[in-house]
Amino acid sequence: MEIILVGHAHTAKAFKEAVEMIYGEVPNFHPIDFTPKEGLQSLTDKIVSAIEPGKTASTLIITDLFSGTPYNASAELVLKKKAADVVAGMCLPMLLEVAVNANNMSVSQLVSHLMKIKEEFSTSLSEKMTTNAKEDDF
């Protein structure tokens, strides 16, 4: 499975570097940064260039923000069948989950898995402490 990361400024490249720092090399992750000097068409062209011929059905695009330019460009490509799916809300825990599972699941299985566990990607110390205190009461 090929994973294309698309984000504002240099978030895509930074996220790939962070994943590699923790997980190891991820050659199937392809970061695309959307800079202030670019428009929708130039970003779309960069994404199309990153999709390997013959691998559209096994290409997942992950963007930083729902409804932002990276997401909109990616969604258009998915609707045109140039990629399998697009997921918004890129974060390090999500990308580590993708790195672990990308070679063991299809795109649709991985997307379904991510949607099931997405609430595990963030937490609050005070919430954890409250939950643990309630559990200790029993």
From Swiss-Prot:
Matches recorded under InterPro entries: Bacterial_PTS_sugar_comp, PTS_EIIA_man, PTS_EIIA_man-typ, PTS_EIIA_man-typ_sf, PTS_IIA_man
SUPFAM superfamilies: PTS system fructose IIA component-like
Any GO BP annotation: phosphoenolpyruvate-dependent sugar phosphotransferase system
Superkingdom field: Bacteria
Swiss-Prot/TrEMBL induction comment: Induced by L-sorbose and repressed by D-glucose.
Active-site positions on this chain: H8 (tele-phosphohistidine intermediate)
Record text about domains: The EIIA type-4 domain is phosphorylated by phospho-HPr on a histidyl residue. Then, it transfers the phosphoryl group to the EIIB type-4 domain.
Keywords: Cytoplasm, Kinase, Phosphoprotein, Phosphotransferase system, Sugar transport, Transferase, Transport
Positions of the PTS EIIA type-4 domain: 1-125
UniProt entry tagged with the keyword Transferase: yes
Subcellular location: Cytoplasm
GO molecular function terms noted in the UniProt entry: kinase activity; phosphotransferase activity, alcohol group as acceptor
Protein name: PTS system sorbose-specific EIIA component
Family matches, as NCBIfam families: EIIA-man
Modification Phosphohistidine occurs at: H8
Main location per the UniProt record: cytoplasm
Pfam families tied to this protein: EIIA-man
GO CC annotations, alphabetized: cytoplasm; membrane
Its job: The phosphoenolpyruvate-dependent sugar phosphotransferase system (PTS), a major carbohydrate active transport system, catalyzes the phosphorylation of incoming sugar substrates concomitant with their translocation across the cell membrane. The enzyme II SorABCD PTS system is involved in L-sorbose transport.
